[in-house]
């Protein structure tokens, strides 16, 4: 698969404070990549580096094969970006907004505007003033604006902010359609983890400036679903026994409970081992966690943002 975005050992320090610390990840052609992290984790700083607003202190960023530090203009041409709510002129029509932006890009052919309008399904309302649009329609117009330059990578920062459930679903379906029909890669920064779970193919989790995980959403959800909670006595003896099984991972104690990751199919086998070793089993249950639960665990339960 072709790499549309590649970060390698990227760091950013301002006035001696490290905001982003040696992060590396890739985004491939035709995929939706979610970027998650709590407040102050380094998400905004990373996005500012991706779109060329600030330069990395260390490391390299490549966009569609163009190194940002040596081929800045070529790299930036490959990106379309919306940071939260798109910047639009409410007193102009949707068409006039797109036409103004097209002029800035040197686009003189109305066919390109018509193409993106049809793509975001705004043809019936494109000649109405933007101030009459719903927030969801404004998001779609903003995406149309970002697509005018035919980018290979679309960066959306908190795209669902302010949208009602219907608007969120509409945006999610549109992103999937966009990727399928145009083979565009989409990079989404968001704090709505349930949405990331439904929209994205892969996810990168950043905390305190460091990447703590890059994985497929499918694998993360599977991992979360394999958590098992044990209530046993004596606790330490049970922990020692669990540690002898290499297939049982991430063994932790919380409020006299033992939490671990293991196949639910092994529960009966472990119960038999506990009984044989005179360990009293008071309770056991599988944890049907969500991606959000796993995220909170990875980031120390910090507030999302």
How would you label these PLM feature ranges?
Residues 1-4, 302-305:
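Short, Lys/Arg-enriched, disordered terminal segments
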Residues 67, 108, 123, 248-249, ...:
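Short coil/loop linkers at secondary-structure junctions
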């Amino acid at each position: 698969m072709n790499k549309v975005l590649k970060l390698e050992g990227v760091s950013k320090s301002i006035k001696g404070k490290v905001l982003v610390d040696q992060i590396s990840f890739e985004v491939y052609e035709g995929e939706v990549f979610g970027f998650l992290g709590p407040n102050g984790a380094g998400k905004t700083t990373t996005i500012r580096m991706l779109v060329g607003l600030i330069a990395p202190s260390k490391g390299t960023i490549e966009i569609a094969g163009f190194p940002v530090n040596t081929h800045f203009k070529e790299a930036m041409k490959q990106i379309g970006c919306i940071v939260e709510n798109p910047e639009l002129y409410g007193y102009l029509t949707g068409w006039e907004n797109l036409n103004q932006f097209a002029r800035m890009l040197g686009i003189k052919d109305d066919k390109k505007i018509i193409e993106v309008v049809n793509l975001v399904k705004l043809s019936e309302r494109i000649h109405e003033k933007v101030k009459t649009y719903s927030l969801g329609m404004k998001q779609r117009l903003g995406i149309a604006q970002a697509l005018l330059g035919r980018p290979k990578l679309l960066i959306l920062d908190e795209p669902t902010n302010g949208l009602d459930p219907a608007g969120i679903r509409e945006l999610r379906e549109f992103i999937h359609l966009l990727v399928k029909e145009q083979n565009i890669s989409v990079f989404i920064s968001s704090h709505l983890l349930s949405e990331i779970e439904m929209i994205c193919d892969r996810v990168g989790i950043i905390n305190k400036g460091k990447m703590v995980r890059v994985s497929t959403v499918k694998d993360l959800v599977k991992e979360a679903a394999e958590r098992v909670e044990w209530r046993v006595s004596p606790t330490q003896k049970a922990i020692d026994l669990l540690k002898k099984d290499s297939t049982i991972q991430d063994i932790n104690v919380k409020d006299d409970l033992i939490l671990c990751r293991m196949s639910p199919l092994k529960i009966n086998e472990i119960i038999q081992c506990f009984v044989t070793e005179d360990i009293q089993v008071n309770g056991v249950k599988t944890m049907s966690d969500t991606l959000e639960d796993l995220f909170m665990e990875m980031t120390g339960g910090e507030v999302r943002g």
